[in-house]
């Protein structure tokens, strides 16, 4: 037995030794930023990765270094952290490890305050994980001496490196060898968002290659260089195009050579890659744009670089690129701005540089997703340089239905076994509905980073009113949330997102001259496609889809729900369902990976709801449909007006190409935000609807994550959605939860509408007025106690003078060069991280061009942030918890201090608990002047730490109303 155990240990060690060099190989940028289950596995449990074919190797101008470092956990204990260093340069073959060491010395200067301490780098060997695990908590840690600074960079580019603080003695305490991670808090993360990324330019920084003195690190001290000079070095050889004469009827865009000179260079617009943008605008919000046709302003955006919404055990996947087209207005604005004819920062300022890029939208509904921008670098007569950003309007180009046939369904033994999952799905569904499955709920929460604050938002201290007592995994996945409070909606929007999901595709289809959608095959993902008529109606023969006008368009949007998402589906618009068709089929996974592999949506089990809508309320009956597609282990789709799940009682055999569908004529009026169904696990929702040609669906984009109820489509020319009185029973008709609550108090008659929802508990529906009363109570409870982090910041944080915490600002130089010096948090860019000991929280805010990290202390009296049912800052250790209900803006003041403004809305009881008071408050956080050193850097990733000086809280608006439920 002992020999067998020794053999097993030897094999495991050998496999680990094989895997580490391969796992630390330089990955291409595309592989690095595409999150998948394999990429998230530690290299130690991917032993055969050495035999897998790698993607593109790093080009000669970019080298990726995987860095492991020590960080403090508590007062004495240490743990390891990881970061990626991206080294840019045109002659990296001559670069040495000392160049990177000099850059890291500047970043981690706060870790080298002790005399004779230096930053050392050595190779990370396969022994280190085990060695550090055994010695990290001891008084002495042997870290080694480090590699010589003259080591060529290419020799270590394919290896994992270990960075530590070196002392003259061969051994050191863990605390003294660890790096201070605070400078990284302002650094953007990429890919699966569990690694920080530092960008370094070898060409611009002018780093010294000389050997340092013994026991003393050489100070970096690069010569100060202007942003324009740095950009010229970075953009040398980048793609570009030229702008024609100003004032022409149509902008004359033309491709020009990178070696053009004279007047053409002054009108040149660069299209840098995401990697180039990351040097002088290091932000995860900016990404490259590839112009495909300069004549009509068509461009493509690599979605893998633009948006990722990851979570721990599995993730959304988006690859490929998406095509957009500048509108005529966008092209005119581009031409005028490039020629410097509009909005110069000051009189006499000249344009030095024009960049075409894209970024994520900020919070709100008034920016396109993605937001395409012209970035201009200006120089004033006094010699100062500043950035200016101008959004450019774009539109979806019409999809021409030129595809004649769909791809064949995959065949083969393995594909057949994988596709025939109906019996397995039923077994999994039966197990998930048993009470013993409840013990696995916490595991699912941890693996998928599920938002506990939302998941338990329907919990009530009186269990008679609670809808968050989950007796099985199935009940947890179909859980309700306090949708009326936790979702932002815009009553002006004609289309709202039907579910928490990732938008896999969104495009428009132009009909023929008769208004018919003549070809039934439409594109889906990459090279795959699906049959529109078969997808909606099954295999039966139906006439071509006829639009009301040849000038209208058919909009198609495919939305993917992951296991972490809220799994109820809400109506995206005010419309009428006239038929529902249940189409049996296969139930394999509908993940994007499978879609790209050839699985087609029209082969899947699904329920198609078909009807019509009148977006302008002028008597039209435009085609509208919402189709819910089942996923593996799902089946049994639940509709809010059906007592039993569809397909649950049907005796269906093996998964085959069914030639039969089950149609039912209905007459169901639905309102925007009204519940229409629920899934039992992850799946897909497909919206296909007819709308006027100028209908705007650009507020959300492909591969962006949307929340149920989020505005997704608007009528053109500023027209607003006509509100219907019958829809006043639902949140979608109101601007805020408070307005909805005030109306609900006066209209108990809407109970007749609300109790028709079969997803509500049966006991509530059987009691007259009960459903209305429970919706009213849940809304009051959410207004009073929702958004626990807002309550902590407003009522508990900084109430007494003392340690107010600190703030880390990422990219201060870029923010300083912004014309107004301000930035704001992007959509879904606000996250909360809690320390393991629950004594500190860190608020991470990602802006358009900079990042802010705010650290605050949590006392024992404030532990409600981590407790049931509030969970205000409970999430994955690396990914954090998404923060809702707080807006953030920040500005870099002339004295190099930061002013951070948080806007929160909280509720409280007044007058002996009879009055609900909802106040919107501004929290202004003023810091001391930030640490210096970053002013000399014009490229690369920089950050600075600022101590908080004062915290001021000022109420802006107050709304009050009488509580219906005084016992809350």
Swiss-Prot record:
One of its GO terms (molecular function) is phosphatidylserine decarboxylase activity. NCBIfam families: PS_decarb. The active site is at 500 (charge relay system), 570 (charge relay system), 683 (charge relay system), 683 (schiff-base intermediate with substrate). Residues 1-25 form the signal peptide. GO terms for cellular component: mitochondrion; symbiont-containing vacuole; transport vesicle. Heterodimer of a large membrane-associated beta subunit and a small pyruvoyl-containing alpha subunit. Is synthesized initially as an inactive proenzyme. Formation of the active enzyme involves a self-maturation process in which the active site pyruvoyl group is generated from an internal serine residue via an autocatalytic post-translational modification. Two non-identical subunits are generated from the proenzyme in this reaction, and the pyruvate is formed at the N-terminus of the alpha chain, which is derived from the carboxyl end of the proenzyme. Binds 1 pyruvoyl group covalently per subunit. The keyword Nuclease does not apply. It is found in: Parasitophorous vacuole; Cytoplasmic vesicle, Secretory vesicle. InterPro entries: PS_Dcarbxylase, PSD-B. It comes from the Eukaryota. The record marks 682-683 as: Cleavage (non-hydrolytic). It catalyses: a 1,2-diacyl-sn-glycero-3-phospho-L-serine + H(+) = a 1,2-diacyl-sn-glycero-3-phosphoethanolamine + CO2. Keywords: Cytoplasmic vesicle, Decarboxylase, Lipid biosynthesis, Lipid metabolism, Lyase, Phospholipid biosynthesis, Phospholipid metabolism, Pyruvate, Signal, Zymogen. GO terms for biological process: phosphatidylethanolamine biosynthetic process. The modification Pyruvic acid (Ser) is found at residue 683. Its EC number is 4.1.1.65. Its main location: other. This is Phosphatidylserine decarboxylase 2 proenzyme. Catalyzes the formation of phosphatidylethanolamine (PtdEtn) from phosphatidylserine (PtdSer). Plays a central role in phospholipid metabolism and in the interorganelle trafficking of phosphatidylserine. Can act on liposomal and host cell PtdSer. Pathway: Phospholipid metabolism; phosphatidylethanolamine biosynthesis; phosphatidylethanolamine from CDP-diacylglycerol: step 2/2. The keyword Endoplasmic reticulum does not apply. Its cofactor is pyruvate. It is an enzyme of class 4 (lyase). The gene is PSD1pv. Belongs to the phosphatidylserine decarboxylase family.
